[in-house]
Amino acid sequence: MATLRERQGYRERVLTALYEATEGNRLLGIPGRKLRNDLRIPEEDLAAACTYLAGEELITVDWEPGNTPAMVSLTHQGIRRMEAEKEERG
């Protein structure tokens, strides 16, 4: 199982990848397998990151059997958070 720092990093990487791939459009999503392969996150850690982010209402997840994300999308709150972080960085 991942350490706390790794889990936090996975969550940030998922949010960033979603925001960049969808250009902040909540109607678009990314297949979970593509997200896992692109980010090279272990399957169980990706599932844990998605579960956490969905619980925070930052993403929505359509699940496949076996706790594998089928499709992952940003919510309005997720977009707002990513835009606020982008503004802070300048």
Each language-model region and where it sits:
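Minor-groove-contacting beta-hairpin "wing" of winged helix-turn-helix DNA-binding domains
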Residues: 66-74
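Short acidic, hydrophobic short linear motifs in intrinsically disordered regions
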Residues: 24-37
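Short alpha-helical segments that sit at the start of domains
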Residues: 1-17
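Short, amphipathic alpha-helical interaction segments positioned at domain boundaries
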Residues: 76-90
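Short amphipathic alpha-helical interaction segments
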Residues: 40-55
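Short, locally clustered residues in the helix-turn-helix/winged-helix DNA-binding domain
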Residues: 16-23, 86
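A short, conserved structural fragment
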Residues: 54-66
